[in-house]
Amino acid sequence: MTRPKKPALPKAKKVRGVVPSAEAQKLLINAAIEMLHILPFDQVTARAITKKVGLSLPTISNNFGSMAGLFNEVTIKLRNNVLARHHKILDQSISLDPDFILRTRLVAWLTLEGENPGQFNNQLIENIAPQFQTALGGLSLRTTTAWLTLIIFMVEGHALFSEVHEYPATQITDGITLLTQLRQQLQNSENALGWNN
């Protein structure tokens, strides 16, 4: 029985001399993201990351305190990448973005590994609620927050379990179409619930 081949990574670079902290952090974060996209998370180790970029092993603890600190910075970088690509507040394709999916899975994994979930709370709802309210014609903060909470739970669930369920692409498209239609009814729902005060 032959073993499956591991994904090929670029060859490790020779060990660099001393580099400025900001440069080291950038190298480590970018290398971690590249590796997390193609390897099982438990194979993305401090040794593997530092070897890939040619830095010494203590560079991670010197710059981030620990691997958890590095991974926390990775989640922030992934979030910023996603928001930069999907700056239109009503763009629902964010849920299919590879960095969004990676961030969601990484946060879930780190939480299961015992990390404090609160450190990964990026106040996404608080940050986008005002823009979302304006885009939809002035919904109340209560309605906006309730809607965004449901949407975030759905897209995070999709990021974690889409491969388990193996839904056809048409089913996902239909779901997004239905959500778009429901979103257009939020003002009526808000009025019916009395949340427009």
Question: Where are the regions that the model predicts?
Answer:
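Hydrophobic alpha-helical connector segments
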Residues: 73, 80-113, 125
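N-terminal intrinsically disordered/low-complexity leader segments
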Residues: 1-23, 194-197
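Helix-turn-helix
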Residues: 21-27, 31-69, 73
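Amphipathic alpha-helical interaction segments
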Residues: 27, 102-106, 146-153
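Alpha-helical DNA-contacting segments of helix-turn-helix folds
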Residues: 64, 70-78, 82-85, 118-121
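Mature extracytoplasmic domains of secretory-pathway proteins
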Residues: 114-117, 124-133
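Short alpha-helical functional segments enriched in proximate histidine and acidic residues
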Residues: 35, 81, 131-135
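Hydrophobic/aromatic-rich alpha-helical bundle segments in the mid-to-C-terminal region
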Residues: 122-125, 134-197
